[in-house]
Amino acid sequence: MRVYLISFFFTAIYVVSLYTFPVARPRPSLNRNDPKVITARCISVLLASSVCCILTRLIIGPSLNVFTFPTDQVLKSLLHAATIFIGPLYEVWIVDKEYRLFFIHLKDCLSNAIAWRNIIIGPLSEELTFRCCIVPICEAAGWSRLKIIFVAPLLFGMAHIHHTYEFLLAYPNAYIAAALQTVVQFSYTTVFGWYTTHLFLSTHSLFPSFLVHAFCNSMGLPTLYGKIGNRNQTRIYYTLLLLGVLIFYMTWGITDFNNHQDFEPRLVPLN
């Protein structure tokens, strides 16, 4: 039971921290893309994830160092994640020819608060809290690998439900839209959490899950319907989209790493 309480506590620390600063608190006129709101929330979640890291170390001891960088496993994780985006990558690089503007886009991202939130601070703070803290706590409680992969990410999905409250403040009567948004967001964040939890359990390093998270956020959700360029390009895109899913499944084994560090969690009475 204690493992659930600690995990919920860490989740609460993370979510509540978003509203620490008055400028970032929910209100009908709140614009979450306002640079001041983004800055306040980025500072808050970094502090929250740091607190969770300290508490985790106190609970399970110093036996795990999540800040090592296993280069081979990082590259394989990124390559595996990229397979499911073969279609979107074709759209960006071939159809839209975004490679011509790569350095311009890179410069814009480095000076754009939204990009920093979505691609760097958000993934970093979330992976620290929901993978590097909650997952080792579950391991220390003696949970099986399968249970950790499928249960722990539910908290990651729940942590995004607060967006529903903000949505209803802006659109008070849009209950159906809010419910749909909640279900969709909870579903895809939980499923994504299954994958990054698998990566973390396979490496016990922050970086594979963080960099995969950052990459996926930069790509966004793939286009699932509609025209992509001309007719031939549309056919190629959807063919590659399906092929990417197949390759992702067939190459799953490249992410079944032997842990690059021997982590023996100090079993503590958390159940």
From Swiss-Prot:
The keyword Cell inner membrane belongs to this UniProt entry's keyword annotation: no
Keywords, in A-Z order: Endoplasmic reticulum, Hydrolase, Membrane, Protease, Transmembrane, Transmembrane helix
Topology versus the membrane: Multi-pass membrane protein
Catalytic reaction list: Hydrolyzes the peptide bond -P2-(S-farnesyl or geranylgeranyl)C-P1'-P2'-P3'-COOH where P1' and P2' are amino acids with aliphatic sidechains and P3' is any C-terminal residue
Enzyme's top EC category: hydrolase
Site (Transition state stabilizer): 213, 217
A GO-annotated cellular component: endoplasmic reticulum
EC number, UniProt record: 3.4.26.1
Pfam families named in the record: Rce1-like
Residues passing through the membrane, by range: 3-23, 42-62, 174-194, 236-256
Recorded GO MF terms: metalloendopeptidase activity
Gene Ontology BP term (one): CAAX-box protein processing
Active site: 126, 160
Subcellular location: Endoplasmic reticulum membrane
Family (UniProt): Belongs to the peptidase U48 family.
Entry function: Protease involved in the processing of a variety of prenylated proteins containing the C-terminal CAAX motif, where C is a cysteine modified with an isoprenoid lipid, A is an aliphatic amino acid and X is any C-terminal amino acid. Proteolytically removes the C-terminal three residues of farnesylated proteins, leaving the prenylated cysteine as the new C-terminus.
Matches recorded under PANTHER family: CAAX PRENYL PROTEASE 2, PROTEASE U48 CAAX PRENYL PROTEASE RCE1
Protein name: Probable CAAX prenyl protease 2
Species for this entry: Schizosaccharomyces pombe (strain 972 / ATCC 24843)
